[in-house]
């Protein structure tokens, strides 16, 4: 049945994402590895795995890509509510609310905040740091997989190595700019999308290279990040007070 296929696809995506998130979490908890570098390296593994299965499932053979999946029957497709984007937006909105409640009002959210500030303090407070790290990254992996499921089952209905493009790196920027507040992330995301579309329009109007949009957006983000230094720290200029011998 159509509904059952959606449930199975979602469950498989969440399980795969949770396992993918568990790997760097285990190494972080066990040997204190750098989770940022670890996950960046795993990105290349994920891309090659995707490339492999694209060749295995390519349609037609030799095309090097997968066509629209179940285009005739639409089996496994998320139902359209108004248009292809409305239901994914509603799902993301619901997830945003749930994540805010989880981070702000649950015991797990409190533990994440304490461990993020200082693992040593968390240990003194009786929090099992290793368990928090693994649980948090497994949940993060599952949420990322949820986004991948929405992209494939709700919007693109196909699989490519560039289906998410650079959204993962953009998500890191959005999270940092939003101070990890789920609601502010929505505003930050809209800002980045507006900047990207505006820069693309400028590049198109002036007949510039397609990379110009990324360069312009990067420059703007650079200055936004630079201002964080002056927000966090107070710069004071002092005259040298050396005494003559």
Ranges and model annotations:
Residues 97, 124, 128-131, 199-245:
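Cytosolic-side transmembrane-helix boundaries in multi-pass membrane proteins
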Residues 35-105, 212, 244:
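Transmembrane helix-bundle core of multi-pass membrane transporters
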Residues 81-158, 182-183:
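Helix-loop-helix "hairpin" substructures at the membrane interface of multi-pass membrane proteins
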Residues 1-19:
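Membrane-embedded helix boundary and interhelical linker motif in transport proteins
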Residues 13-19, 43-51, 88-101, 140-147, ...:
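Hydrophobic core segments of alpha-helical transmembrane domains in multi-pass membrane transport
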Residues 28-30, 103, 177:
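Helix-capping/transition residues at the boundaries of transmembrane alpha-helices
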Residues 13, 138-144, 148-218:
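Transmembrane alpha-helical segments in multi-pass inner-membrane proteins
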Residues 61-65, 109-114, 233-245:
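Short, Lys/Arg-enriched, Gly/Pro-containing loop segments at transmembrane-helix junctions
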């Amino acid at each position: 049945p159509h509904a059952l296929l959606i449930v199975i696809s979602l469950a498989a995506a969440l399980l795969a994402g949770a396992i993918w998130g568990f790997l760097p979490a285990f190494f972080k908890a066990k040997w204190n590895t750098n989770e940022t570098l670890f996950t960046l390296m795993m990105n290349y593994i994920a891309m090659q795995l995707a490339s492999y299965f694209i060749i295995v499932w390519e349609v037609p053979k030799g095309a090097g890509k997968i066509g629209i999946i179940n285009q005739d029957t639409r089996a496994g497709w998320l139902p359209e509510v108004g248009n292809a984007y409305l239901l994914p937006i509603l799902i993301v909105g619901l997830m945003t609310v749930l994540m805010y409640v989880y981070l702000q009002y649950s015991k797990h959210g409190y533990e994440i905040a304490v461990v993020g500030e200082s693992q040593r303090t968390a240990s003194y407070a009786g929090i099992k740091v290793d368990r928090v790290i693994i649980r948090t990254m497994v949940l993060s992996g599952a949420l990322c997989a949820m986004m991948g499921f929405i992209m494939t089952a709700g919007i693109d209905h196909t699989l490519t190595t560039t289906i998410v493009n650079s959204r993962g790196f953009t998500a890191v920027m959005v999270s940092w700019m939003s101070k990890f507040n789920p609601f502010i992330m929505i505003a930050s995301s809209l800002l980045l999308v507006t900047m990207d579309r505006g820069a693309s329009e400028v590049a198109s109007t002036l007949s510039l290279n397609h990379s110009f949009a990324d360069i312009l957006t990067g420059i703007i983000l650079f200055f936004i990040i630079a201002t964080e230094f002056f927000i966090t720290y107070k710069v004071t200029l002092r005259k040298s007070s050396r005494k003559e011998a």
